[in-house]
């Protein structure tokens, strides 16, 4: 009972503790808020004072400028007077004096201190006022010489007979309107020293208390009348101290004349008492608030002492009973709503904890997977029934069983690692003939490791399935590689005869005369091109399956791509009677950054499909670039719509499957390998884009391609050499060419093509023959085949560069479409790689490249 009373008495001191918290925690925070408020208020006051300074400075300078602008306007107007011009001829001084007297009487506020006129020889007239300021004729001549150009105001400090005088001087030319001759110059001068009228004007119009004009901190003029509680010296002292919260606010305004900052400065004086009073009131308000907070803290202590402590002690007694585990009790309630809520919540929490303890025990005991707890010294502490069953342990006396000892020996190294703090997952340790995958995790209590929990899973079946999967995967990889090797070999074997077919067909075009023969040759060319396209589709699909398709992004003009596509397919559509509409909304001066080759392949496949399956009607291709604010990439959207045969909506999902067309009759009627759309879908995925399709039977088809791209302003490049130059006119002289080709047909075609360019061609049937010819003869160009007997094309190229040390340009020709082959040729020293079958246009492009890179450098 004594202990309880002692505890209650101790808990009642919480009121004092809370009061201390209020004072030691809340009070500094509130005090900080007050200080911050004072600081910000002071900053606001300072900013307001600074703003007042800026506004007053700008206003006083504007008034100063406007005053001299008015004098300038009068000066310009007077200089055009006929009276002044007549003076230069008749020298009638009385008329001129009367003229200026009348002007001064009409507007005395904008009258200069003195005036004088000059001609090309010197001063011819002055109004006599200059002598009142100590300015004699010599000084007037000096002023005329110093203000010798433009018609702006000039600040001048001169030493006169009565001391230094600071003045603004301006001149304007006197022109003869009939001849435009400059008769002379009119000068106006405003003396700033003791210019009380100017000071009064600035004071009254700027609404300040007083104005002082200084030059290099020396006062020149002021508006003080003598009854102020300060003098000019006080104004200068406050200007240098810059006390923003002083009773007297002095604002300094440098005078800029003709865009040049002068030594002149205007000091304006304003009463700042209201700002100082506001600051004092704010400080007093802060002190009153602090006193109020102290009183509130003391009153809060008394209230807490009487109302809160007893209720809190009841709540603490309930928590102590739960901690001592003397049995679960119900909370008796509290008069304070918050304490009652806390007690009820604790009651629910204790119930949940008790239920969780039971759940954890059940989870541990009834789990089907073995679970064990080990000490950091690798001593078994506890295991669940599933672990006992697998380890053949019925009670703790059977831990010497061989199965358990073998398991412990293999698990111990991992237990030691976990005891160092490591968490291990996926550790395979068998129990008998079964393989278990174990996870080991250290149990941390207050930062120290108190044990290790080990959980296992039987993966015997999974391991066996993984072995079978690996065997099947290796077999599939072998099969895929064999198919790839077969396709690569067939590519070379098929391209070689296609090269002969297309080459001879292109040569025949130039030798036949009748239209019928030309049509027959066109059929031959189109058939060969179709066969080549089917072969390319099959090879591309094979590369996609093997993941050998490379994406190489670079900037290019999408408008050029659309123009090329239109040039190719518009004649085809015209001959077929199908309307081709191309709408390109991209700016011609914008380049996009993506893989140009793959994008071309996507567009050409889609347009080719549309042309193929649209017997009548139209094909519409629309492209636009969608840009989003803040996004790194833009989105290229290409929509292709045709009025072709379409496809059933339930078969749209099959469109992108390889070797699939809607009906077998479609292949017979329209042709195709069924790979075009498969390649399109895979290329779009590789470019991180999306393709959507809408179609109905007989209602046409719409494809929508969206690709993320980067765009930028197009850099204009110099025009390349035209590819329309006739072959015989491309080279200025006959070139000597070495052709290395083992196939007679290919050699015949290439020789025929080269003759059109007036080339002298030597033919070597393999690499060894080529090496012999190069040892004895100098050539301008080498055309190198890939698969050669005895010594391959890549090896021959390497020998020419490394052993013969020849720099002769080597242009390789290969039927192998693999990028690795092209890279190997370039690494061996080739300068250019062409793909068979060699077309006349492709060969022409290669020769144009050769001329630009090597013949231009040679000249």
Curated annotation (Swiss-Prot):
Signal sequence segment: none
Keyword Aminoacyl-tRNA synthetase recorded: no
Protein's membrane topology: Multi-pass membrane protein
Modified-residue entries (Phosphohistidine), positions: 492
Residue intervals passing through the bilayer: 15-35, 280-300
UniProt-listed Gene3D superfamilies: 1.10.287.130, 3.40.50.2300, Histidine kinase-like ATPase, C-terminal domain, LuxQ periplasmic domain, C-terminal subdomain, LuxQ periplasmic domain, N-terminal subdomain, PAS domain
InterPro entries xref list: AI-2_sensor_kinase/phosphatase, CheY-like_superfamily, HATPase_C_sf, His_kinase_dom, HisK_dim/P_dom, HisK_dim/P_sf, LuxQ-periplasm_dom, LuxQ-periplasm_N
Domain (Histidine kinase) ranges: 489-711
Keywords attached to this entry: ATP-binding, Cell inner membrane, Cell membrane, Hydrolase, Kinase, Membrane, Nucleotide-binding, Phosphoprotein, Protein phosphatase, Transferase, Transmembrane, Transmembrane helix, Two-component regulatory system
Response regulatory domain: residues covered: 736-851
EC number, UniProt record: 2.7.13.3, 3.1.3.-
Annotated positions of the 4-aspartylphosphate modification: 785
Subcellular location: Cell inner membrane
GO molecular function, one term: ATP binding
SMART domains assigned to the protein according to its UniProt record, in alphabetical order: HATPase_c, HisKA, REC
GO CC terms of this entry: plasma membrane
Catalytically driven reaction(s): ATP + protein L-histidine = ADP + protein N-phospho-L-histidine
Coarse class of the protein's main subcellular location: membrane
Presence of the UniProt keyword Hydrolase in the record: yes
Known function: At low cell density, in absence of AI-2 (autoinducer 2), LuxQ has a kinase activity and autophosphorylates on a histidine residue. The phosphoryl group is then transferred to an aspartate residue in the response regulator domain. The phosphoryl group is transferred to LuxU, and ultimately to LuxO. At high cell density, in the presence of AI-2, the kinase activity is inactivated, and the response regulator domain has a phosphatase activity.
PANTHER family: OSMOSENSING HISTIDINE PROTEIN KINASE SLN1, TWO-COMPONENT HISTIDINE PROTEIN KINASE
Subunit structure, interactors included: Binds the complex formed by AI-2 and LuxP.
Protein name from the UniProt record: Autoinducer 2 sensor kinase/phosphatase LuxQ
Organism: Vibrio harveyi (Beneckea harveyi)
């Amino acid at each position: 009972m004594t202990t309880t009373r002692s505890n209650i008495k101790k808990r009642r001191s919480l009121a004092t503790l809370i009061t201390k918290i209020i004072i030691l925690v809340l009070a500094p925070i509130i005090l900080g808020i007050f200080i911050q408020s004072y600081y910000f208020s002071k900053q606001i006051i300072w900013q307001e004072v600074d703003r007042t300074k800026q506004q007053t400075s700008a206003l006083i300078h504007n008034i100063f400028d406007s005053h001299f602008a008015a004098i300038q306007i009068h000066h310009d107007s007077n200089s055009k007077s006929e009276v002044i011009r007549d003076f230069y001829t008749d020298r009638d001084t009385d008329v001129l004096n009367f003229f200026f007297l009348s002007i001064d009487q009409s507007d005395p506020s904008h009258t200069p201190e003195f005036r004088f006129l000059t001609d090309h020889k010197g001063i011819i007239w002055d109004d006599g006022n200059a002598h009142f300021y100590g300015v004699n004729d010599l000084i007037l001549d000096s002023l005329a010489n110093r203000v010798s150009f433009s018609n702006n105001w000039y600040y001048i400090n001169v030493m006169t007979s009565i001391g230094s005088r600071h003045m603004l001087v301006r001149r304007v030319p006197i022109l003869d309107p009939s001849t435009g001759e400059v008769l002379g110059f009119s000068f106006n001068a405003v003396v700033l020293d003791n210019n009380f009228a100017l000071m009064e004007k600035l004071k009254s119009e700027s609404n300040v208390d007083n104005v002082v004009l200084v030059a290099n901190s020396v006062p020149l003029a002021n508006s003080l009348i003598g009854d102020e509680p300060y003098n000019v010296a006080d104004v200068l002292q406050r200007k240098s101290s810059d006390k923003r919260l002083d009773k007297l606010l002095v604002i300094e305004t440098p005078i800029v004349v003709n865009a040049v900052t002068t030594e002149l400065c205007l000091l304006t004086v304003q009463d700042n008492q209201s700002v100082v009073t506001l600051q004092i009131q704010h400080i007093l308000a802060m002190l009153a608030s602090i006193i109020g907070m102290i009183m509130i803290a003391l009153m809060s202590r008394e209230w807490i002492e009487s109302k809160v402590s007893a209720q809190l002690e009841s709540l603490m007694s309930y928590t102590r009973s739960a901690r001592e585990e003397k049995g679960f009790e119900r909370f008796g309630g509290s008069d304070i709503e918050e304490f009652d809520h806390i007690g009820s919540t604790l009651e629910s929490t204790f119930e949940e904890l008790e239920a969780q303890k039971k759940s954890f025990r059940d989870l541990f005991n009834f789990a089907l997977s073995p679970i064990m707890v080990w000490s950091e010294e690798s001593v078994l502490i506890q295991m669940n029934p599933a672990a006992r069953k697998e380890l053949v342990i019925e009670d703790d006396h059977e831990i010497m069983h061989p199965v358990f000892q073998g398991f412990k020996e293999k698990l111990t190294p991992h237990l030691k690692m976990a005891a160092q703090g490591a968490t291990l997952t996926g550790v395979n340790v068998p129990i008998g003939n079964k393989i278990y995958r174990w996870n080991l995790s250290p149990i941390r209590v207050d930062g120290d490791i108190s044990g290790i929990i080990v959980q296992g899973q039987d993966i015997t079946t999974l391991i066996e399935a993984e072995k079978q999967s690996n065997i099947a995967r290796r077999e599939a990889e072998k099969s895929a590689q064999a198919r790839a090797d077969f396709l690569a070999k067939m590519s070379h074997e098929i391209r070689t005869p296609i090269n002969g077919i297309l080459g001879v067909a292109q040569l025949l075009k130039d030798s036949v005369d009748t239209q019928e023969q030309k049509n027959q040759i066109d059929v031959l060319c189109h058939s060969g091109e179709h066969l080549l396209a089917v072969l390319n589709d099959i090879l591309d699909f094979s590369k996609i399956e093997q993941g050998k398709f490379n994406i190489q992004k670079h900037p290019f003009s999408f408008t050029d791509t659309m123009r090329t596509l239109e040039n190719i397919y518009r004649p085809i559509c015209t001959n077929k009677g199908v309307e081709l509409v191309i709408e390109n909304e991209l700016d011609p001066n914008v380049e996009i950054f993506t893989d140009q080759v793959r994008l071309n392949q996507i567009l050409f496949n889609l347009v080719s499909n549309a042309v193929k399956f649209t017997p009548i009607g139209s094909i519409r291709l629309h492209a636009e670039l969608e840009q989003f604010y803040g996004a790194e990439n833009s989105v290229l959207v290409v929509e292709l719509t045709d009025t072709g045969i379409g496809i059933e909506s339930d078969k749209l999902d099959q469109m992108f499957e390889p070797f699939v067309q809607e009906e077998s009759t479609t292949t017979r009627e329209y042709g195709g390998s069924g790979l075009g759309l498969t390649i399109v879908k895979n290329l779009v995925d590789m470019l991180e884009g999306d393709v959507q399709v809408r179609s109905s039977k007989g209602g046409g088809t719409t494809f929508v391609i969206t690709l993320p791209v980067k765009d930028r302003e197009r850099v204009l490049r110099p025009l390349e050499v035209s590819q329309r130059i006739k072959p015989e006119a491309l080279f200025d002289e006959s070139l000597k060419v070495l052709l290395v080709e083992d196939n007679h047909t290919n050699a015949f075609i290439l020789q025929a093509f080269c003759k059109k360019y007036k080339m002298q061609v030597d033919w070597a049937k393999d690499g060894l023959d080529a090496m012999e010819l190069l040892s004895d003869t100098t050539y301008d160009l080498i055309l190198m085949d890939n698969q050669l007997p005895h010594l391959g094309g890549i090896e021959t190229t390497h020998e020419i560069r490394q052993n013969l040390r020849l720099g002769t340009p080597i242009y390789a020709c290969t039927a192998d479409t693999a990028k690795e082959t092209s890279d190997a040729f370039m690494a061996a020293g080739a300068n250019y790689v062409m793909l068979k079958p060699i077309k006349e246009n492709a060969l022409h492009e290669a020769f144009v490249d050769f001329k630009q890179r090597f013949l231009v450098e040679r000249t």
